[in-house]
A protein has these predicted regions:
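Acidic, polar-rich low-complexity tracts and alpha-helical solenoid repeat scaffolds
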Residues: 1-175
């Protein structure tokens, strides 16, 4: 392989990254940038472009998570709680390191409360409280749980049931 291949791959991926559209628009270019940066990282993990690619990949994934949250909030505002739950859970599954995780968990609590699903809302409350204890979302969720008179002693959870690092994508399908 030629020594310039990682650079060429980086330029190709970056050209898609630079044209990343607003979250309201189609995300084909963002998806393509994710694919190209991922391929570069996998093929040339020790190249100097891999580190830059990882940084861009984090930014892209956060952007895509933002889009999912925006769509989910729209569904939620229209009363389509199951559709919004599906979107919020996809953020938890697909964008684990996104800055949108705490808000997605909070919105899941809201949706489950709206559907009258107390156990699910409480479980996500505990996940939020465990993983993001000192955030505005944790404070808001505690208020939401109390305002809806959800019994805070409903169930004791083990650490592995709450830690987002331990939970697998399919675990969210069970909740």
């Amino acid at each position: 392989t030629h020594k310039s291949i990682p650079y060429a791959m980086y330029l190709k991926a970056y050209s898609y990254y630079e044209r990343m559209p607003d979250v309201n628009l189609d995300q084909k270019l963002s998806d393509r940038a994710v694919k190209e940066f991922s391929e570069l990282i996998n093929k040339y993990p020790n190249s100097k472009y891999a580190k830059k690619s990882m940084s861009h990949l984090r930014s892209l994934k956060n952007h895509l998570a933002s889009r999912e949250v925006k769509i989910a909030k729209f569904y939620q505002s229209q009363g389509y709680f199951l559709a919004s739950i599906k979107r919020y859970k996809s953020v938890l599954r697909e964008y684990k390191k996104s800055t949108h995780i705490p808000e997605s968990i909070f919105r899941l609590i809201e949706c489950y409360i709206s559907l009258g699903l107390v156990k699910q809302s409480f479980y996500f409350y505990k996940i939020l409280e465990y993983n993001f204890p000192k955030t505005e979302w944790a404070e808001e969720s505690e208020k939401l749980i109390k305002d809806n008179k959800i019994n805070l002693n409903l169930k004791k959870f083990k650490k592995k049931q709450l830690d987002l690092k331990s939970l697998k994508a399919e675990d969210f399908d069970l909740i």
